[in-house]
C-alpha cells in the first residue's frame, strides 16, 4: 500500500494537517468545497512565479483566511502591497459571503519542498531538458540541502517514445510505511509535444518524535573523514582465493 496511497493522506492527523479547516452542513458543504477549489486555482495561476507550495483555507463564521506558503513572498505581496490587495479583491468575488484575509508564509528552504521540486522539474522538461538529467540534478540538490532521502518518479512518453513508461531516481532513504516519517509529497505535470508527463516527488526530512522532526543522521566515520581530507578513494581488496585440500 505504501506505493499506492497519497503520503499526505496516509499521515493525515498524525504528522500532516488539513489544507481546508472549516465545518459546514450538508447543504453548504459542496458549495464551500467548490469555492476552495476556485480559490486554489486562482492563486496557483496568478502567482505561478512566486513558487506556491501550499494553500490553506480557514473559515470561522463570516471570516475566510487564506494562508499562502511561497518561496518568493515578495511577488505575492507586491510593491506597497498592491498585489495582495488585488488578490484579496478577486478572492472576495469568489466567496459567497464573509470577509477575506490573505496571509503569506515564506518557505525557509525551497530546495526540500516537494511541490516546488516537482514544479522545477516540470519547467525544465518543458524547456526540452533531458529528463534524466533534470531528475538527477533535482535529487542531488535536495540531498545537498539537508534531506534524509528523496524519490523522483516520472511517467509518460519519455523522450517521445511510442510506449509510455516510468523512470525513478532514489537518493538516501524514503520510508513508505512509517507513519511518524516526515515526508513531503508534491506532484506536477509537464506539457510536451508528445503529451503530458506526470511528476511525483517524495522528500524524507526525518522522523517526527515528540512533535519535533529529528533527522537521525549517522555520524561520519573517522575513516571516511580521513579519506575526504586526503582526497583518496577507498581501496577495494579482492578476496584471495583459497586452495582446497587436494587441489592444484
Swiss-Prot record:
Domain of life: Bacteria
GO biological process, alphabetically ordered: translation
Gene3D superfamilies reported in the protein's UniProt record: 3.30.300.20, Ribosomal protein S3, C-terminal domain (3.30.1140.32)
Gene Ontology molecular function, alphabetical: mRNA binding; rRNA binding; structural constituent of ribosome
Gene Ontology cellular-component terms listed: cytosolic small ribosomal subunit
Pfam family, one: Ribosomal_S3_C
Entry keyword set: Ribonucleoprotein, Ribosomal protein, RNA-binding, rRNA-binding
Quaternary structure note: Part of the 30S ribosomal subunit. Forms a tight complex with proteins S10 and S14.
Disordered: region residues: 212-248
UniProt biased composition (Basic and acidic residues): 221-234
Family as reported in the entry's similarity comment: Belongs to the universal ribosomal protein uS3 family.
Record CDD domains: KH-II_30S_S3
Purpose: Binds the lower part of the 30S subunit head. Binds mRNA in the 70S ribosome, positioning it for translation.
Gene for this chain: rpsC
Protein name: Small ribosomal subunit protein uS3
